[in-house]
Regions:
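Acidic/histidine-rich catalytic neighborhood of metal-dependent amide-processing enzymes
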Residues: 108-209, 226-229, 234
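A non-catalytic alpha/beta surface segment that caps or lines the substrate-entry region
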Residues: 28-90
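Structural recognition of the beta-strand scaffold that forms the well-ordered cores
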Residues: 32, 66, 84, 94-98, ...
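Bacterial Sec-dependent signal peptides at the C-terminal "C-region" and cleavage site
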Residues: 2-21
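Aromatic/hydrophobic beta-strand junction motif of beta-rich domains
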Residues: 294-298, 308-311
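Sec/Tat-exported extracytoplasmic proteins
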Residues: 30, 34-41, 57-64, 87, ...
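Active-site-adjacent substrate-binding region
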Residues: 45, 68-70, 182, 189-289
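Second-shell loop/turn segments in exported
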Residues: 16-20, 34-47, 71-74, 107-118, ...
Length: 333
């Protein structure tokens, strides 16, 4: 091989684009997770789920960290485990992209949570493969959260978001919260009839970047213009002063029913969210990096306090929106 050909080959390797999000791979992960069956926190099935997630991430060349603890729920003590992988970037300041992998505990019917618990985990496994090959401006931590679902039938008080609250508290204690710049949450993104609304309890600039990205990609039929208020795993981060956004489709007839199966989901929906998240990531990295450069210090944002005004209520018709508590945010988004 001539020197010229070697140079051309080296240039091609250097500029090769990172792999794209592959919904076929994500769908296969979702299929495998759903095949495990119901996966509530503390169950043998969720242990099997953790094993599958860990095997897939390890095969992608990533090191999985377990964060385990015993949680006192209104029913009993439950072992819970968050899983995370860290993908280094040009800066150690990091973005967390998270989703829960547990399913709600039901004894009266078989609940496999294809979209609610399955889609977020499957999405993150595939996203890990893509981000590992990407040149990241910031360090990215992918976080698989346990214990998002309430143990009692209804979402209330502190019987929910166990994993995200534990993660934030541990990050506060060990000092790692100081390098956490923003958080993106994916939840219930498998809906065959995907309709993601802006969450009014999410940070406005993150919402704007995501919805602008969807519009540029001609995906605004899926990321639609109206909004609702959601209580989810992003709120413990917001309460700690971290900009956070919830990407969630609550307009889902199969939510918390035996019909939340693969038949109610679509690989296309996973692809849409993958394309938007990856398309938005450069802008998010640029905004965070610019802020760090301008301030000349490692700050994680203005502290916001979050107040629950009234409990979540469920509305069952097709165009219902599951409103988990309305919140007021004392600082501007």
């Amino acid at each position: 091989m001539t020197a010229a050909l070697v140079s051309v080959f080296a240039l091609q390797v250097a500029v090769a684009p990172p792999p794209k999000f592959d919904s076929g791979r994500a769908w296969e992960h979702l299929r495998q997770l759903v095949a495990i069956g119901p996966r509530p926190s503390g169950s043998p099935a969720i242990e099997q789920t953790r094993k599958y997630i860990t095997e897939q991430l390890t095969a992608a060349g990533l090191s999985v960290v377990e964060q385990a603890w015993e949680e006192q729920t209104p029913i009993e003590k439950v072992k819970m485990v968050n899983l995370s992988v860290t993908i280094p970037g040009a800066r150690r300041d990091r973005i967390v992209i998270a989703g829960h992998y547990d399913t709600k505990l039901y004894r009266q019917f078989r609940f496999v949570g294809a979209s609610d618990g399955g889609s977020s985990a499957a999405f993150l496994i595939e996203l890990a493969r893509v981000l590992k090959a990407r040149r990241n401006a910031l360090t990215i931590e992918l976080l698989f959260l346990d214990g998002e679902e309430a143990r009692l039938p209804e979402w209330s008080g502190t019987d929910n978001t166990y994993g995200s609250r534990h993660y934030v508290e541990m990050a506060r204690r060990d000092g790692s919260l100081a390098t956490l710049r923003t958080m993106m949450l994916v939840d219930m993104i498998g809906d065959r009839d995907l309709a993601i609304r802006r969450d009014a309890n999410s940070t406005t600039w993150l919402n704007n970047i995501l919805w602008d990205t969807a519009r540029r990609q001609d995906l605004d039929d899926y990321f639609i213009a109206d909004s609702t208020r959601i209580e989810d795993d992003h709120l413990p981060f917001r309460a700690a002063g971290i900009p956070a956004v919830d990407i969630i489709d609550l307009d889902y007839d199969a939510w918390h029913t035996s019909n939340d199966t693969l038949d109610a989901c679509s690989a296309r929906s996973l692809q849409v969210v993958g394309d938007v998240v990856l398309g938005a990531l450069p802008q998010i990295e640029a905004k965070v990096t610019k802020s760090l450069v301008l301030t000349g210090r490692r700050v994680h944002g203005t502290k916001r306090s979050v107040h629950v005004l009234h409990a979540k209520r469920k509305v069952r018709p097709r165009d219902r929106v599951r409103e988990r508590a309305h919140l007021s945010l004392e600082a501007a988004h």
